[in-house]
Amino acid sequence: MAVSSKHIPAPDLHRVRRALLSVSDKTGLIDFAKALHANGVEILSTGGTAKSIAAAGIPVKDVSEITGFPEIMDGRVKTLHPAVHGGLLAVRNDPEHVAAMEEHGIGGIDLAVINLYPFEEVRFKGGDYDTTVENIDIGGPAMIRASAKNHAYVATVVDPADYADVVAELEKHSGSLPLAFRKKLAAKAFSRTAAYDAAISNWFAEAIDEETPTYRAAAGKLHSVMRYGENPHQTAGFYLTGEKRPGVATATQLQGKQLSYNNINDTDAAFELVAEFDPARTAAVAIIKHANPCGVAEASTIKEAYLKALACDPVSAFGGIVALNRTLDEEAAEEIVKTFTEVIIAPDATEGAQAIVAAKKNLRLLVTGGLPDPRAKGIAAKTVAGGLLVQSRDNGVVDDLDLKVVTKRAPTEAELNDLKFAFRVGKHVKSNAIVYVKDGATVGIGAGQMSRVDSARIAARKAEDAAEAAGLAAPLTKGCVVASDAFFPFADGLLSAVEAGATAVIQPGGSMRDDEVIAAADEHGIAMVMTGMRHFRH
């Protein structure tokens, strides 16, 4: 049953006479405590926070002095006491609450400055189970929630970035804080505890291999506010979850304008794709537009891989994202800057390459320090009206699959290498996806069509256009291989690929008409490999 309210109006300005400071992150703590003391605020504190404040010569009272109870159980129990929570939760102009405070000797607390044990940091650094559990804060969230609920009389500060604003408001209002400001702090406080609990619940689900927990929480911390979202009439913000997976969220931006919503989405897609290629084996480049690849290639150098990728669809590459699986060097940088590019993302960049890119001041250059592991577990989520779709990350890798040759002719070694390449790329193309590959480079990509045969035709037409632009008589698809992200429901998609010049095919299989498709391949002397794994992408 819901708890009813007494409807006691909150004061607009509430005087801050007493503050409780208990922080794990001590950034800015001493200057803030000095400012509170200068504004006549009595400071209560706990453990290490109290020691730091006292060491700076600022008067401070340990919370055990008001509870009459020492910290026990390795600090697990120190603020879970009525003298603390009564001071945070009391409604100051409710006679019953005031009487209870007087009867039990509870003093009001007007400002709660709390930040939490670094659970998220320990979690993502790979702390062992017991260490991670020990970093689950109990008293901190309890105090934050208590003070934020009672924002009519208590201001709650959970972020050192807000210290300056608190001091400014205190000085502006002669030692008081306005209700609107207290509400703003309370909203932030509840979002902080929600994010903290989300991190804990998600970690526990992973720890016990619970893939579909009864409750699923998602949370992140605001990193930046976008100028707009996918379109100018949409608002947007970029939130970080704390996951250390190398990519756009963890990258260092060395130069260029602020990343837009679409930049971030496309850059993530590009870097996840290029990470499919082991840098110890080959250099690889992916060029992305609207989260779909325009061209992907591998070679002995990044420069060569870039030029091969660009040749696939140089028109669409204009204004695209370029992702590398190796360090950006001077030779590659000189080629990339010849075409208008929004973002370059790479594990690293040489000083010479950075100097070349610097000539294009708006070009964003990101370095990540590494590549994401395509085999790593993770989750992918999508919102729908009234719900959240959550699934495991598509971490299937073609090198790990049991490939089956289903035609009379087996692919040659060169064809098989290109087939695997094409299937890696197809995993990152919006469905229905058809990818033509020759000599370690895409030569035609068909994406996002409602019918597979249309994707095959579009990819072939793009290959013809690219050949014409390069002054070649034959289409780039002549003698190529083709990958499909899902099975061919009919032979028509395969026949379109054959017509384009493909000599070998890789696809998941699983259609009720597989025999018909295989027969068509045999009739045309095509080698076909089935993977048993589909890569739909929507």
Curated annotation (Swiss-Prot):
**Molecular functions per Gene Ontology:** IMP cyclohydrolase activity; phosphoribosylaminoimidazolecarboxamide formyltransferase activity
The biological pathway it contributes to is: Purine metabolism; IMP biosynthesis via de novo pathway; 5-formamido-1-(5-phospho-D-ribosyl)imidazole-4-carboxamide from 5-amino-1-(5-phospho-D-ribosyl)imidazole-4-carboxamide (10-formyl THF route): step 1/1; Purine metabolism; IMP biosynthesis via de novo pathway; IMP from 5-formamido-1-(5-phospho-D-ribosyl)imidazole-4-carboxamide: step 1/1
Q: Which UniProt keywords apply?
A: Hydrolase, Multifunctional enzyme, Purine biosynthesis, Transferase
> Is Acyltransferase among this UniProt entry's keywords?
no
Per its record, the protein catalyses: (6R)-10-formyltetrahydrofolate + 5-amino-1-(5-phospho-beta-D-ribosyl)imidazole-4-carboxamide = 5-formamido-1-(5-phospho-D-ribosyl)imidazole-4-carboxamide + (6S)-5,6,7,8-tetrahydrofolate; IMP + H2O = 5-formamido-1-(5-phospho-D-ribosyl)imidazole-4-carboxamide
Gene3D superfamilies in UniProt: 3.40.140.20, Methylglyoxal synthase-like domain (3.40.50.1380)
Q: What is its EC number?
A: 2.1.2.3, 3.5.4.10
Q: Which cysteines are joined by disulfide bonds?
A: none
Decide whether keyword RNA-binding is in the record.
no
Q: Which residues form the MGS-like domain?
A: 6-158
GO BP, one annotated term: 'de novo' IMP biosynthetic process
CC terms in the record's Gene Ontology section: cytosol
Q: What is known of its domains?
A: The IMP cyclohydrolase activity resides in the N-terminal region.
As for family, the record states: Belongs to the PurH family.
The protein in question is named Bifunctional purine biosynthesis protein PurH
